């Protein structure tokens, strides 16, 4: 990272620290200049005749996602109706604590959400009320918000930013076409779904029914994102959203806000008069777009003209975007959040999710509470229509997933621990039984004082949906140990099964190698290296012994490629943002994975290991053989094995990692491509204990060699810990 990027990264640390610290303090004031004094909330009905309204009894509370003076946001599961089993976010507002300002915000949010229908805007499914409370049932977005990702990774690549801004531009244009000014654009209000697409939320500060000729005058939003015309209260239109769009772009690209003083007064002065310092590490197209958005005269701002969003879409920064494909969500997001099962809440603040979800009865503000909030009930039209089986996504009822951050439920409350399966230097693996369902799992118990499990958990959550990667079910943290609950591998270790198998041929060896190499190619393409791909970490899911049941396990030493600033890199953008030595190390680690697969393939074919004769070989002897790159490819089984097999083995075990095959090259090798023509004849094998002992000796010798310094997760740094406070709050005057 060059000096200018480091400067912005440091500014980002303190920026995030300050805004997180301020999140707990409510600085919102209200002077409803546009709306006047509101005595009654009048919201027209949107419920179609003949369809049953929703009520609180139809929702099972699972977790608390957020909480404020207004009420709570819960993760809930619908337990009745055609969408039973579906997960939602339920926003609960207490009528008695809603001031006039809050009632207007609730009215505005509910009205707008009921009106809009867009792929990049959060959807309102139900709205209803009881005597004391208002309920909004919304999409549950498992990926958390953009602020969480930005605060962890400091800044994004231009390709990442281009994707997020493009989806956001379509969402804002849709709101503007309905006469709505959003007015609170910031990373906290941009959510990510499980695939990584955005959805904007929180319409409490939005202004409805504004056309291009009418202006709004409220002083509202989040100071750092306010347009100059909002700050000086001379009236604003939809153009104010494009200024905020520019602030968000600047923040994502640099990790810093463009205008931020030591207090609100200084920040407002900077917005009105300060000259923007343009970071020179940004591309010319990015700088051009920022300058076009940061026009203090809103009439000159990009997006404010008669063509609206088309001006932005035509800008050279977005030249690679196919807008129709983007709208259909056919462009793959640059970042996929680490999510596991549907009810996982890893990306939500553990301060809230650790709380017991309870919805206490609300006290009505007055005897005419229902009159004040009349017409609040709503049912989405998509729920009124008879859903097809394809549209209905029934979520099975699972126990609540416990977060890495810990809570008041201990692992043994839900599971019964059984015998050991395996023991490592920093963890032990045991069989366990889920008490409620009597289902068997494996639990990996990690000593936190010896190893930080964060990287392993993130990788398993992000990539564990692959059919040949072990699936993570639950995560518990009791402060001293972390418990990773995973599917139980009933088929045992790959090498055990192969060596004990009565018949095992060259053709079967190619099938096995193909399955594992496809898995590694997938991981390597995502910037993930396993780094501990020994045969004992490759197991069968069941007793079938089929290649499809193979699982790659134990990601304790795995790493995800990251830039120097901690940014999790996606495959397309590494060249410009990752230091050469990091790329070199990543390539070396990937080559080590292939070398380990070469060891496995050699053993499957020859019936013995290439560099160790038995468990009594010393580490020095084994390392000397590995260093020389000499091993037998003649005699024994090798005399009946194809030349293609010998070729792929030699290229996977090449002593120079730069000349070793990649995973993709292995998959394209004729021995793998044409495996149906390979010999089905049985291969001879040595004693299983002798081979396993030699394999263990090989990896023991390798593990004795000096290791590169272990990099701690970004969030464990002192600077990152100082950031972990609170977020910016919105203001309305």
UniProtKB/Swiss-Prot annotation:
One GO cellular component from the entry?
A: meiotic spindle
Q: Which reaction does it catalyse?
A: L-seryl-[protein] + ATP = O-phospho-L-seryl-[protein] + ADP + H(+); L-threonyl-[protein] + ATP = O-phospho-L-threonyl-[protein] + ADP + H(+)
User: Looking at the record's lineage, which domain of life comes first?
Assistant: Eukaryota
Q: Where does the record place the modification Phosphoserine?
A: 218, 377
Q: Please list the cofactors this protein needs.
A: Mg(2+)
Q: What class of enzyme is it?
A: transferase
InterPro entries the UniProt entry points to = AGC-kinase_C (IPR000961), Kinase-like_dom_sf (IPR011009), Pkinase_C (IPR017892), Prot_kinase_dom (IPR000719), Protein_kinase_ATP_BS (IPR017441), Ribosomal_S6_kinase_II (IPR016239), RSK3_STKc (IPR042766), RSK_N (IPR041906)
MF terms (GO), sorted A to Z: ATP binding; magnesium ion binding; protein serine kinase activity; protein serine/threonine kinase activity; protein serine/threonine/tyrosine kinase activity; ribosomal protein S6 kinase activity
Q: What is the effect of changing residue 311 to K?
A: In a metastatic melanoma sample; somatic mutation
Its tissue distribution reads: Widely expressed with higher expression in lung, skeletal muscle, brain, uterus, ovary, thyroid and prostate.
Q: What residues does the AGC-kinase C-terminal domain cover?
A: 319-388
The EC number on file is 2.7.11.1
Anything known on activity regulation? Answer: Upon extracellular signal or mitogen stimulation, phosphorylated at Thr-570 in the C-terminal kinase domain (CTKD) by MAPK1/ERK2 and MAPK3/ERK1. The activated CTKD then autophosphorylates Ser-377, allowing binding of PDPK1, which in turn phosphorylates Ser-218 in the N-terminal kinase domain (NTDK) leading to the full activation of the protein and subsequent phosphorylation of the substrates by the NTKD.
A Pfam entry, by short name? Pkinase
Name the job this protein performs. Serine/threonine-protein kinase that acts downstream of ERK (MAPK1/ERK2 and MAPK3/ERK1) signaling and mediates mitogenic and stress-induced activation of transcription factors, regulates translation, and mediates cellular proliferation, survival, and differentiation. May function as tumor suppressor in epithelial ovarian cancer cells.
Oligomer and partners: Forms a complex with either MAPK1/ERK2 or MAPK3/ERK1 in quiescent cells. Transiently dissociates following mitogenic stimulation. Interacts with FBXO5; cooperate to induce the metaphase arrest of early blastomeres; increases and stabilizes interaction of FBXO5 with CDC20.
The family annotation for this protein states: Belongs to the protein kinase superfamily. AGC Ser/Thr protein kinase family. S6 kinase subfamily.
This chain belongs to which protein, by name? Ribosomal protein S6 kinase alpha-2
| Originating organism | Homo sapiens
């Amino acid at each position: 990272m060059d000096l200018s990027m480091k400067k912005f990264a440091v500014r980002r640390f303190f920026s995030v620290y300050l805004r997180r610290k301020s999140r707990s303090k409510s600085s919102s004031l209200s002077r409803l200049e546009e709306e006047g004094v509101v005595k009654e909330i009048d919201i027209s009905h949107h419920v179609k005749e003949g369809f049953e309204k929703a009520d609180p009894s139809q929702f099972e509370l699972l977790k608390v996602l957020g909480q404020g003076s207004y009420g709570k946001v819960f993760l809930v599961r619908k337990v009745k109706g055609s969408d039973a089993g579906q997960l939602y976010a339920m926003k609960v507002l207490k009528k008695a604590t809603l001031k006039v300002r809050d009632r207007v915000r609730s009215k505005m949010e509910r009205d707008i959400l009921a009106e809009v229908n867009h792929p990049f805007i959060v959807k309102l499914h139900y709205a209803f009320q009881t005597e004391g409370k208002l309920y909004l049932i919304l999409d549950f977005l498992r990926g958390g918000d953009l602020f969480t990702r930005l605060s962890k990774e400091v800044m994004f690549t231009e390709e990442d930013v281009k994707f997020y801004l493009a989806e956001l531009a379509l969402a804002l244009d849709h709101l503007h076409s309905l006469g709505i000014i959003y007015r609170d654009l910031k990373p906290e209000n941009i959510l990510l779904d499980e695939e990584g697409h955005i959805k904007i939320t929180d319409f409490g500060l939005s202004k409805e029914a504004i056309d291009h000729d009418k202006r709004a005058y409220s002083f509202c939003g989040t100071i750092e994102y306010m347009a100059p015309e909002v700050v000086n209260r001379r009236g604003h239109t939809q153009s104010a959203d494009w200024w905020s769009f520019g602030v968000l772009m600047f923040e994502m690209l640099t990790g810093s806000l463009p205008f931020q003083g030591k207090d609100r007064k200084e920040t407002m002065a900077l917005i009105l008069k300060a000259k923007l310092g343009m970071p020179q590490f940004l591309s010319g197209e990015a700088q051009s777009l920022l300058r076009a958005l940061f026009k203090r005269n809103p009439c000159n701002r990009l997006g404010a003209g008669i063509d609206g969003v088309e001006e932005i879409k035509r800008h050279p920064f977005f030249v690679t975007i196919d807008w129709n494909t983007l709208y259909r969500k056919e462009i793959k997001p640059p970042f996929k959040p680490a999510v596991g099962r549907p009810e996982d809440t890893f990306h939500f603040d553990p301060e809230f999710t650790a709380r017991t979800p309870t919805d206490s009865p609300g006290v009505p503000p007055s005897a005419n509470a229902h009159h004040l909030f009349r017409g609040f009930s709503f049912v989405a039209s998509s729920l009124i229509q008879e859903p097809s089986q394809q549209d209905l996504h029934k979520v099975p009822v699972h126990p609540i997933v416990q977060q890495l951050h810990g809570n008041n439920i201990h692992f043994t409350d839900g599971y019964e621990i059984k015998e050991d399966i395996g023991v490592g230097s920093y963890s032990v693996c045991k069989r366990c039984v889920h008490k409620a369902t009597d289902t068997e799992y494996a639990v990996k118990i990690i000593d936190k004082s010896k190893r930080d499990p964060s990287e392993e958990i993130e990788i398993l959550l992000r990539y564990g949906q692959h059919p040949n990667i072990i699936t993570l079910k639950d995560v518990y943290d009791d402060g001293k140990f972390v418990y990773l609950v995973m599917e139980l591998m009933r088929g045992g270790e790959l090498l055990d099964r192969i060596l004990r198998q009565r018949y095992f041929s060259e053709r079967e060896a190619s099938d096995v190698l193909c399955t594992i190499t496809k898995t590694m190619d997938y991981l390597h393409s995502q910037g993930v290296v396993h780094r501990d791909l020994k045969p004992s970490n490759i197991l069968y899911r069941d007793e079938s012994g089929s290649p499809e049941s193979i699982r790659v396990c134990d990601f304790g030493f795995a790493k995800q490629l990251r830039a120097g600033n901690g940014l999790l890199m996606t495959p397309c953008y590494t060249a410009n943002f990752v230091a050469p030595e990091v790329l070199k190390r990543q390539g070396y680690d990937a080559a080590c994975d292939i070398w380990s697969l070469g060891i496995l393939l050699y053993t499957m074919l020859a019936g013995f290991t290439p560099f160790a004769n038995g468990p009594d070989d010393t580490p020095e002897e084994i390392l000397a053989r590995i260093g020389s790159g000499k091993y037998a490819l003649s005699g024994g089984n090798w005399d009946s094995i194809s030349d293609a097999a010998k070729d792929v083995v030699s290229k996977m075990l090449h002593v120079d990692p730069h000349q070793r095959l990649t995973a993709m090259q292995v998959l394209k090798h004729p021995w793998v491509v044409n495996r149906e023509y390979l010999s089905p004849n049985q291969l001879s094998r040595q004693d299983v204990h002798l081979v396993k002992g030699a394999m263990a000796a090989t990896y023991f010798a390798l593990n004795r060699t000096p290791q590169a310094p272990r990099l701690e997760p970004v969030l464990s740094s002192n600077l990152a810990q100082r950031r972990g406070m609170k977020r910016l709050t919105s203001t309305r005057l």
